[in-house]
Amino acid sequence: MPSSFDPKKDAANLRKHGVSLVEGDGVLNNLLLLTIEDTASEGEQRFVSIGMNVFGQLRVVVYTLRGDDARIISVRKPEPKEVRAYEEGV
């Protein structure tokens, strides 16, 4: 799935989480991916996916759909409970 993100948001995400939004593209294009709808988001429909980036590192990606593209909102390292959920789910 093609993806896009705001360069300013990328800089903010890098400062906050130490991870670039660029990594989200690799996660969303990985076949071993767990995705749920983020029911806590208000306004637009958002999804949370966990999977491996192109470097083989587990990442959590928050995104919304804009047409045929995934608009990446956030990428971060997973919490221990998210790692377990991924390992049990795939």
PLM-predicted stretches and their roles:
Residues 1-90:
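Ribonuclease/tRNase effector modules and their secretory precursors
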